[in-house]
């Protein structure tokens, strides 16, 4: 077999070499045929025939010689060195000592001298009777008669040509799409001998070979199976853009062939057929030969003779005249698109009309191959049919030179080559060009070079253009140019053509004639390569040139102006939606694809429906058997129940696979005593151990309708089902979605795309888990099951009803009927939505079915119910609750009806919008008005994982604003409705336990927990980390003003990026560059003195905040797993408007939390604080006491100065601050401030001491009503929001540390200290909350001995703190002395986190000294106050020496231990 393959390869190689040699001689034959006139054609043919005869004679002589040699060999014994014993064949190579003998033991059964008669008989049978050749070698014998040899070896062998392995013509050949017919490039995978069929006409074409492959698709050589005619079929890619391009080509060729060239005399390609095969558009053409580029390539890229070029140009001009009369532009004329009809003749035809368009109705701006691209296309102006004449001039020069005339490797390089040879482009052309400024410079004045050039391109305008240099172009366009190669030694066209080499065989006379021809040829090309399209010759003018007509040349040719075709730019005929080609109807592209998809999908659906029907029949039979068995068992149970005087709770185990299953678990089953009611029917679920794989239908005797349960997963506890809730089933039907593409309804899964059943069931409650209406339905129906699963008897088992009384049964049946009606309505709505073909789902709908099959949180997050048990107990419920629930359900039904009406309105709007978009899209595609190619599959939906099954209607955002507005309105309406329901329900039935809440459910309905809990936890971690990074970056980047607020003030704004601020947009304003530069310079020039150490502000868990209120402000890193219950106004009498004299937050205050009366509720601090001031009124609580730095109207921060009277700390109503913008409160809205996002951030802490420890608190007290410059260091807060038993505990809220200069620079006139009437001893905050509670517990649990020890420890701690305070005061005095020595500018501390210094604010140095003096006085006063408090504490300790057993509460200092 190896020898046979070698022989076949040799034969193939010889044929290829012979064809290559014939291609080399082809050009000479074409030239000879083109030179001879019609009179000499007969003589040339005779000469060729004679030459052929001579060649045949020579071949015959050679064959005779070969035969003689074979005969001689046979006479000598056939083969040299044959050993008949061993059947060994030897052959000698060389001679003498170097002689080598080759032994061949193959085919030893062929013995040459054995039985000549047998060999002759075999030869006669094979038809090899040759008297000259008595024997053939095994290679020749087995090559020619291989099939006969196989037949001899195996009599059962039969050769079938169709079973031969087929060669693949498409690369890559790996199937990927379109049912395995397409590869990764959407090309149809073609094999040799494939049959391509026109399904409409029944015409079949057999694939023979490949002719080429490109970006459009591929061209294959085929044979018509009916007529054996060879054709070329162009198979386009399975993409919509190429389909549209092929459709244009079909229409263009049809109009040219039928109307403008019906006799096929103008060298335009003929269209034979067109159809669709396997979703690919196929166009059948006549079969042609090689193109002109291949002809030049076969000539080793040497130019052709002027005579042959003349023959080609005449035919091309004839074709262009036809195109001009038809107002058609080819747009892609090049040597590759000009093909020879036959190898032996110069007849050509123009092909590839895929880029053709009508004049003045141009489709694309990126047309023509770069080497043949006209100047108007390069610059980006309106083009016409003259661009084809420019391409013809480039083709003419390339045929003569063998290389492209302008071989640019980029558009800039192409323009530079044209400018170098033909001059600068006309100014009129550059003025209209869209890309002119990209490649040219525009200068004022007149260009001196225009006078030297033949073409004056300035036209008397006051400006001129020059080409950009390579450096300028690379700098402006930010690109890098590749190096280009110059192929010609001359720059001008006449020099290049005249200096081209001559043939060596030419005589001097022939050279002179050739020079004259070249001069005429140069003038012809010069007229085609005019830069101005208006001066460029038309095809009619070019055809009258002496080079074409052969007339004598008397100088530069001046064309006839009357033959110049003035382009009328008439509107071309639009491509009709339906056109007929050879009796075959070509439909619109949308209809074609839809029909094909419908046919395929209909076949698949029919098969699926048949299978489903068979399965349903089998299931029904099984269910009937099970139902009969079940009825028998049920009758027996009912008889037992009727005999008993009391209702017994019986266990009915779930039967797995129709076998009884028993267990020792005592799971109660509440059954009815009525035997005739369908409520006693128990559904048998044939389940695997934990999952129900398929839905099972169950039909009762009273109602034959089938009930489909959703796919669920069951826990081990959910094996038992209570009989009271067995027949309360939700009827669900498969939803038929009307697909836009195929238009055929198909069954789809009830789960959303990409979803699977959760581990503990599917959500069926219409309310979210954090809603107060959640899980309040007493009946265990599929609609009232737990939100986290419908598994019966799970940890969150729902409450079931035992309808034992007649009234309860009636109400139960009414409720069941209403539920079924609601579900049916919802199903109908869903069907209507799907039939409309919308790809979007209504996210804001509250229908049950919209949320039936969505995955939610895991079972560990289920909110526990006060009546539920861990073993699936189902206690009875009273009638009062049933009536209330019926009222709630009626309200829900009304809400659902309103929502359904809203949905219908939305659907109608969406349908109208879709129709408009489809009409616009079809008109754009049919008319091809757009400047770019149509998108591929524009209607395909783009899925977003964040929506978990919900799809946006359009990814391009056509109607995003409208949909967003409607969604926001719906969300607001739903939120208002839910709030009303919650308030009503809380008034009627206050909840025992507050439902838990997750951070994801805080921000509205756009976020879902559709994945498993582990996956979502990972996503939450990513989201949290992003929020952390944003928070950290914003703190570093923003420049804050120092505010005198506590570290986490009770009235401080919420932390940025927290759930309370997620819905508020971050406002960004423009910062002038000059002010930014000034700020940067000031920062660089400022010194860096001592900076205080910042403390961490991590929130404390609410469990440890014994005295904190129930409102809690979470940090960005903490998960909110409980609800925020806002206290009502009646529970907080101190927050009434009558008790508060002033608005604490100002006019522009805003809070994300509000109480029932609309007032703002401040967020809760994360550190325990005093609440006393809140009892006395919000007016006494003062913070962020920042004075107005610039009293004049010209403020450096462009802040409007306002005035507002506020009340002091001591309760007096004297006005001490005339500026409403105290400390730049974050709750105020400063529209004129240019600092971005300044007031959305938490202010950093500050105090007046630079090195003062945060834990060393200074006592508060005393009265000082003077306007001093000291800041309050101890701010007392009340705890009126807590119960009355815990309102006596007072905690001091000390200000955090900061440098002296920073605080002074920010305060012009300080506030007054607080008069503290309570027993506060300045207790430090160094101990944590756990230590505080541990100390209280030990105090209560231990005896008097432990109590005394604790008192001693507290005294020791107080002494240590006093010592620390004294040390800190000494350090402060030392530092203050150092700062006094320095200049006022050095006394200012650097801005901490972007704080302003005194120089920036504009505070003079005298005020700083005054502030320092006032602060020293305040320190002395505070020290005296601390000493008084310590004395009071010691007196109280002496009085409270009674044993702790006789006391319930002990007040120690500012603490109350319970």
Swiss-Prot record:
Chain segments annotated as coiled-coil in the UniProt record: 588-643, 878-927, 1346-1383, 1409-1442
Q: What class of enzyme is it?
A: transferase
Q: Which GO terms describe its molecular function?
A: ATP binding; protein kinase activity; protein serine kinase activity; protein serine/threonine kinase activity; protein serine/threonine/tyrosine kinase activity; protein tyrosine kinase activity
Sequence positions that bind ATP:
211-219, 234
Q: What is the catalytic activity of this protein?
A: L-seryl-[protein] + ATP = O-phospho-L-seryl-[protein] + ADP + H(+); L-threonyl-[protein] + ATP = O-phospho-L-threonyl-[protein] + ADP + H(+); L-tyrosyl-[protein] + ATP = O-phospho-L-tyrosyl-[protein] + ADP + H(+)
Where in this protein does the record put region Disordered?
32-83, 441-462, 545-571, 659-714, 791-874, 930-1095, 1128-1161, 1233-1347, 1375-1399, 1435-1458
Enzyme Commission designation: 2.7.12.1
State its location(s): Cytoplasm
Supply the alphabetized keyword list: ATP-binding, Coiled coil, Cytoplasm, Kinase, Nucleotide-binding, Serine/threonine-protein kinase, Transferase
| GO process terms (BP) | adenylate cyclase-activating G protein-coupled cAMP receptor signaling pathway; aggregation involved in sorocarp development; chemotaxis; hyperosmotic response; negative regulation of gene expression; positive regulation of gene expression; regulation of G protein-coupled receptor signaling pathway; regulation of gene expression
Is Coiled coil set as a keyword in this record?
Answer: yes
Among SMART domains, the record links this protein to: S_TKc
Positions with biased composition (Low complexity): 32-76, 446-459, 659-709, 791-800, 808-853, 861-870, 961-988, 1016-1042, 1064-1093, 1246-1255, 1264-1279, 1292-1309
Q: What happens when the gene is disrupted?
A: Null cells fail to enter development, express low levels of cAMP receptors, are smaller than wild-type cells, are hypersensitive to nitrosoative/oxidative stress, and display slow growth on bacterial lawns.
SUPFAM superfamilies, alphabetized: Protein kinase-like (PK-like)
Q: What does this protein do?
A: General sensor of environmental conditions, such as heat stress, effecting changes through pkaC. Essential for survival to nitrosoative and oxidative stresses. Required for cell cycle control, not only at the onset but also during development (aggregation process and postaggregative development).
Entry's family note = Belongs to the protein kinase superfamily. CMGC Ser/Thr protein kinase family. MNB/DYRK subfamily.
Record protein name field: Probable serine/threonine-protein kinase yakA
Query: Gene symbol?
Result: yakA
């Amino acid at each position: 077999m190896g020898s046979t393959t070698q022989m076949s390869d040799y034969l193939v190689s010889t044929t290829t070499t012979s064809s290559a040699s014939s291609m080399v001689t082809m050009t000479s034959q074409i030239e000879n045929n083109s030179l001879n006139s019609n009179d000499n054609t007969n003589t040339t043919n005779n000469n060729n025939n004679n030459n052929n005869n001579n060649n045949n004679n020579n071949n015959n002589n050679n064959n005779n010689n070969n035969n003689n040699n074979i005969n001689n060999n046979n006479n000598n014994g056939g083969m040299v060195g044959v050993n008949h014993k061993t059947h060994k064949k030897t052959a000698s190579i060389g001679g003498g000592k170097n002689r080598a003998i080759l032994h061949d033991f193959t085919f030893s059964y062929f013995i040459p001298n054995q039985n000549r008669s047998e060999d002759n008989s075999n030869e006669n049978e094979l038809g090899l009777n040759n008297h000259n050749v008595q024997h053939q070698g095994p290679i020749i014998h087995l090559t020619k008669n291989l099939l006969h040899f196989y037949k001899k070896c195996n009599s059962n062998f039969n050769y079938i040509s169709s079973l031969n392995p087929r060669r693949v013509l498409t690369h890559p050949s790996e199937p990927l799409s379109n049912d395995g017919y397409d590869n990764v490039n959407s090309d149809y995978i073609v094999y040799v001998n494939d049959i391509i069929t026109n399904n409409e006409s029944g015409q079949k074409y057999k694939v023979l070979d490949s002719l080429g492959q490109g970006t459009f698709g591929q061209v294959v050589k085929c044979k018509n199976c009916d007529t054996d005619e060879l054709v070329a079929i162009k198979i386009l890619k399975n993409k919509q853009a190429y389909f549209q391009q092929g459709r244009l080509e079909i229409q263009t060729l049809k109009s040219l062939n039928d109307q403008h060239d019906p006799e096929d005399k103008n060298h335009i390609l003929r269209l034979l057929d067109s159809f669709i095969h396997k979703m690919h558009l196929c166009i059948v053409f006549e079969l042609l030969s090689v193109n002109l580029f291949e002809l030049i390539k076969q000539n080793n890229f040497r130019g052709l003779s002027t005579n042959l070029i003349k023959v080609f140009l005449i035919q091309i001009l004839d074709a262009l005249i036809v195109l001009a009369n038809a107002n058609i532009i080819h747009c892609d004329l090049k040597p590759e698109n000009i093909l020879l009809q036959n190898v032996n003749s110069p007849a050509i035809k123009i092909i590839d009309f895929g880029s053709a368009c009508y004049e003045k109705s141009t489709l694309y701006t990126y047309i023509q191959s770069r080497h043949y691209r006209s100047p108007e296309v390069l610059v980006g102006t309106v083009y016409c049919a003259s661009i084809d004449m420019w391409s013809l001039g480039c083709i003419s020069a390339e045929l003569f030179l063998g290389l492209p005339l302008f071989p640019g490797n980029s558009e800039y390089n192409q323009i530079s080559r044209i400018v170098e040879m033909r001059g600068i482009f006309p100014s009129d052309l550059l003025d209209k060009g869209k890309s002119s400024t990209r490649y040219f410079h525009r200068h004022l004045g007149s260009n001196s070079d225009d006078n030297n050039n033949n073409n004056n391109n300035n036209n008397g305008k006051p400006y001129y253009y020059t080409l950009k240099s390579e450096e300028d172009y690379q700098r402006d366009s930010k690109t890098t140019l590749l190096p280009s190669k110059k192929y010609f030694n001359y720059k001008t066209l006449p020099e290049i053509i005249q200096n081209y080499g001559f043939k060596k065989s030419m005589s001097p006379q022939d050279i002179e004639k050739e020079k004259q021809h070249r001069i005429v040829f140069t003038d012809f090309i010069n007229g085609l390569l005019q830069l101005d399209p208006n001066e460029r010759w038309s095809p009619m003018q070019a055809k009258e040139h002496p080079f074409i007509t052969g007339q004598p040349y008397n100088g530069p040719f001046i064309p006839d102006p009357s033959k110049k075709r003035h382009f009328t730019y008439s509107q071309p005929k639009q491509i009709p939606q339906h056109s007929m080609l050879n009796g075959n109807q070509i439909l619109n592209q949308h209809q074609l694809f839809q029909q094909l998809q419908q046919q395929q999908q209909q076949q698949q659906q029919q098969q699926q429906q048949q299978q489903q029907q068979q399965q349903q029949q089998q299931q029904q039979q099984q269910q009937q058997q099970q139902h009969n068995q079940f009825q028998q068992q049920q009758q027996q149970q009912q008889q037992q129940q009727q005999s008993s005087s009391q209702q017994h709770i019986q266990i009915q185990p779930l039967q797995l696979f129709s076998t009884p299953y028993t267990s020792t678990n005592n799971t109660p089953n509440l059954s009815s005593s009525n035997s005739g009611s369908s409520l006693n029917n128990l559904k048998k679920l044939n389940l695997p151990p934990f999952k129900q794989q398929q839905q099972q239908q169950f039909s009762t005797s009273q109602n034959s309708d089938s009930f489909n349960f959703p796919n669920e997963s069951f826990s081990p506890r959910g094996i038992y089902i209570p009989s009271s809730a067995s027949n309360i089933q939700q009827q669900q039907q498969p939803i038929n979605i009307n697909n836009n593409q195929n238009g055929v309804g198909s069954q789809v899964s009830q789960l959303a795309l990409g979803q699977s059943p959760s581990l503990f069931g599917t959500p069926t409650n219409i309310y979210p888990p954090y809603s107060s209406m959640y899980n309040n339905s007493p009946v265990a129906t599929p609609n009232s099951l737990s939100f986290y699963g419908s598994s019966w008897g799970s940890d969150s088992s729902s409450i079931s009803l035992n309808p034992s009384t007649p009234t309860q049964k009636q109400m139960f049946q009414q409720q069941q009927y209403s539920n079924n009606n609601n579900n049916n309505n919802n199903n109908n709505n869903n069907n209507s939505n799907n039939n409309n073909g919308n790809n979007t789902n209504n996210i804001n709908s509250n229908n049950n079915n919209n949320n039936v099959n969505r995955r939610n949180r895991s079972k560990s997050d289920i909110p526990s119910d006060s009546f539920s048990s861990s073993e699936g107990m189902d206690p009875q419920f009273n009638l009062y609750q049933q009536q209330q629930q019926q009222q709630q359900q009626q309200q829900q039904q009304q809400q659902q009806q309103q929502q359904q009406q809203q949905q219908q309105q939305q659907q109608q709007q969406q349908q109208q919008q879709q129709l408009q978009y489809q009409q616009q899209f079809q008109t754009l595609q049919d008319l091809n008005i757009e400047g770019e190619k149509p998108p591929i599959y524009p209607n395909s939906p783009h899925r977003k994982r964040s929506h978990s099954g919900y799809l946006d209607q359009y990814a391009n955002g056509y109607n995003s604003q409208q949909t967003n507005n409607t969604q926001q309105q719906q969300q607001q309406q739903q939120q208002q409705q839910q709030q009303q329901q919650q308030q009503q329900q809380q008034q009627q039935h206050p909840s025992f336990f507050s439902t838990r809440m997750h951070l994801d459910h805080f921000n509205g309905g756009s976020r879902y927990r559709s994945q498993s809990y582990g996956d979502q936890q990972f996503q939450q971690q990513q989201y949290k980390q992003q929020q952390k990074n944003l928070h950290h970056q914003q703190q570093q980047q923003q420049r804050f003003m120092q505010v005198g607020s506590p570290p986490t003030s009770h009235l401080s704004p919420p932390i940025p990026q927290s759930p309370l601020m997620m819905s508020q947009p971050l406002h960004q304003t423009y910062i002038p560059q000059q002010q930014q530069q000034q700020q940067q310079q000031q920062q660089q020039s400022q010194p860096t003195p001592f900076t205080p150490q910042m403390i961490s502000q991590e929130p404390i868990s609410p469990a440890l905040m014994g005295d904190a209120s129930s409102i809690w402000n979470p940090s960005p890193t903490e998960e909110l797993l409980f609800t925020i219950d806002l206290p009502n106004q009646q529970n907080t009498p101190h927050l009434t408007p009558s008790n508060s004299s002033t608005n604490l937050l100002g006019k522009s205050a805003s809070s994300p939390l509000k109480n029932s009366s609309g007032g703002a509720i401040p967020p809760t601090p994360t550190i325990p604080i005093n609440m006393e001031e809140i009892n006395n009124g919000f007016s006494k609580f003062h913070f962020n006491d920042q004075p107005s730095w610039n009293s004049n109207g010209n403020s450096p921060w462009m802040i409007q100065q306002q005035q507002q009277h506020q009340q002091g700390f001591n309760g007096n109503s004297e006005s001490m601050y005339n500026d409403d913008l105290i400390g730049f409160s974050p709750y105020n809205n400063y529209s004129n401030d240019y600092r971005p996002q300044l007031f959305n951030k938490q202010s950093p802490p500050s105090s007046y001491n630079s090195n003062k420890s945060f834990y060393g608190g200074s006592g508060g007290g005393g009265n000082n009503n003077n306007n001093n410059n000291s800041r309050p260091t101890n701010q007392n807060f009340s705890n009126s929001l807590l119960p009355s038993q815990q309102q006596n505990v007072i905690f001091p809220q000390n200000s955090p540390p900061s440098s002296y200069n920073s605080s002074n620079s920010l305060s012009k006139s300080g506030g007054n200290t607080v008069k503290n009437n309570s027993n506060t001893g300045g207790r430090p905050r160094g101990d944590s909350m756990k230590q505080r509670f541990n100390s209280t517990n030990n105090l209560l649990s231990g005896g008097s001995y432990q109590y005394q020890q604790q008192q001693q420890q507290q005294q020791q701690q107080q002494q240590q703190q006093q010592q620390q305070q004294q040390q800190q005061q000494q350090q402060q005095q030392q530092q203050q002395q150092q700062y006094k020595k320095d200049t006022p500018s050095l006394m200012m501390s650097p801005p901490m986190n972007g704080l302003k210094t005194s120089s920036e604010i504009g505070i003079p140095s005298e005020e700083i000294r005054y502030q320092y003096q006032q602060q020293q006085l305040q320190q002395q006063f505070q020290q005296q106050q601390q000493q008084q408090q310590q004395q009071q504490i010691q007196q109280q300790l002496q009085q409270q020496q009674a044993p702790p057993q006789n006391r319930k509460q002990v007040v120690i200092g500012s603490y109350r231990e319970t």
